[in-house]
Amino acid sequence: MYPQQIIDALRHVRYPGTGKDLIESGMLEDDIRISGLEVSFSLIFEKDNDPFMKSVVKAAEVAVQTYVDANAAVHIHTKFRKQNLQPQEEHSPLKAKKIIAIHSGKGGVGKSTVTANLAIALARQGKRVGLLDADIHGPSMPKMFHTEDCRPVSVEEGGRTLIEPIEQYGVKMLSIGFFVDPASAVVWRGGMASNALKQLIEDAHWGELDYFLIDLPPGTSDIHLTLVSLLRLTGAIVVTTPQPVALVDARKGVDMFRNEKIDVPVLGIIENMAWFTPAELPNNRYYIFGHDGGKNLAEELGVPLLGQIPLVQSIREAGDDGEPIAMQEGHPAAKIFDEIARKI
């Protein structure tokens, strides 16, 4: 074995956060050591809580054994450009192991439906889940969780007055929809919306959480920049339909998170409304918005495809009734959300 063979093998491994191979991403340290069938080298990650670290290290090992020598004993060390920073400052009431933003480039692709069902799926798996409805101008979580008439109360914690999130179906939740007239439009400038969002994060009694999901507004706005400045996001999920016009904006969403000023790992793409299945013909699939658009985009950008969700009437009805489909154990759609939840 020769060092150049190792380098060439690692060109076959993509880092999901950028879509580039390990060499192009500058992740290989100049420390390749070879002794007989033993080879060692180091991979450099930006931070020590990189969500892709384990999978990338494994893929690198497999690449050497596949493209260089099947009997190679591969030893991979990890180094970090930045040490792990706490997701929040110590004084913040928000303490979450994973903070995940769920985004769509275009409205109407089912992002909020996906977010609500993922939150419930995680809660049903025994996780402590918080959900922030950050879609200030179009909050939909109160409706989807059947909590339109709920109003958060204040609690005292450590000498501070905090907002107590509404808890429903095992999910702690806050939304601007709890504080405004549901029949009135929220007409705020970017600064007002960002300040309201900041208060829902910093002045709320979230407690200890395993997952904190953020339902982002579609597109790009001040709200997205506010979140990045307030929280150290574990990663982002992009929701799209297979329709070409939606894929254009989904691509922009991935590019936004990969921008060096944002620098948030893209955990994957969810293709919603992947096909239509009528209730009377559960085995039939009609690709009314296109076939595998989200899947193909994920492959092109080098990010995981977390799942494909069909367009079925029961998902829409469950959300409108305030009891998302993920609550229906055994339902085919609930199983899909459960599988996606386990991947994140």
Kindly label every feature range from the protein language model.
Residues 1-32:
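N-proximal, solvent-exposed amphipathic alpha-helical segments enriched in charged/polar residues
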Residues 10, 28, 96, 107, ...:
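Residue-level signature of catalytic and energy-coupling elements of molecular machines
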Residues 57-58, 210-211, 217-308, 313-317:
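Conserved catalytic-core segment of NTP-binding enzymes
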Residues 98-136, 262:
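Walker A/P-loop phosphate-binding motif and the immediately C-terminal alpha-helix
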Residues 122-183:
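Phosphate-binding loop that captures ATP/GTP phosphates
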Residues 321-331:
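C-terminal boundary of histidine-terminating zinc-finger modules
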